[in-house]
Amino acid sequence: MSGHSKWATTKHKKAALDAKRGKLFAKLIKNVEVAARTGGGDPDGNPTLYDAIQKARKNSVPQDNIERARKRGAGEEAGGADWQTIMYEGYGPNGVAVLVECLTDNRNRAAGEVRTAMTRNGGSMADAGSVAYLFNRKGVVLLPKNGLSEDDVLSAVLEAGAEEINDLGESYEILTEPSDLVDVRKALQAEGIEYDSAETNFLASVNVPLDADGARKLFKLIDVLEDCDDVQNVFANFDVSDEVLEEVNA
């Protein structure tokens, strides 16, 4: 679990600095638009929209882009697309289970992109339900340490519903039930504790340990999937040790 989380944290730091930044912006803007359409355009009354806007800001998406996406979703401005959330399931190299979350206005295009990415990079598609049972939906909050101890964080969020705190090296990861995510985020804010993101993700209940070769193959598949315009998130049930992660990143 910790190896997977450290990899994801490192990957997203790099994504903010390289050519994938444009794709990341597009995904974050899409999240804002969909959140506004689903729960209304007022962030104070729509926690999902609030968190989508905060995440976009943290990743340096221009405020004007964020506001236009909010207005499109809320129907205050023309041009909003009919986005659909679709989950695809499959297997990656070494039998790793893969969940691909798409947000698309063209179901056939999304399915084709995901299938091509999987089959060309050592993966295969699976029937609905084949791997989804290996994952649980959880609220996940990431926050920089900023001199905070694990006890500092725990005392701030325990009564709000935090289930687990993981030390990821430079940051902490707080896990909650999805229904407690907003309360945990608000508890951090009440204590003046800065956080990087608060969102729901699919976390694996069982992980497949990978060596460096297996990790490289899987990371390539995930990178190709995430490069697809319709793909918002990719979840996989793998774990890598710190040593393997260092070898892969060397």
From Swiss-Prot:
Cellular component, GO annotation: cytosol
Check the UniProt entry and state the signal peptide residues, or none: none
Against Pfam families, the record matches this protein to: TACO1_YebC_N, Transcrip_reg
Q: Where in the cell is it found?
A: Cytoplasm
GO biological process assignments: regulation of DNA-templated transcription
Disulphide bonds annotated for this chain are none
InterPro entries recorded: Integrase-like_N, TACO1_YebC-like_2nd/3rd_dom, TACO1_YebC_N, Transcrip_reg_TACO1-like, Transcrip_reg_TACO1-like_dom3, YebC-like
Keywords noted in UniProt: Cytoplasm, DNA-binding, Transcription, Transcription regulation
Provide a Gene Ontology MF annotation, just one: DNA binding
The protein's predominant localisation is cytoplasm
Give the record's family classification. Belongs to the TACO1 family.
Q: Tell me which HAMAP family the record gives.
A: Transcrip_reg_TACO1
Q: What is this protein called?
A: Probable transcriptional regulatory protein SACE_2018
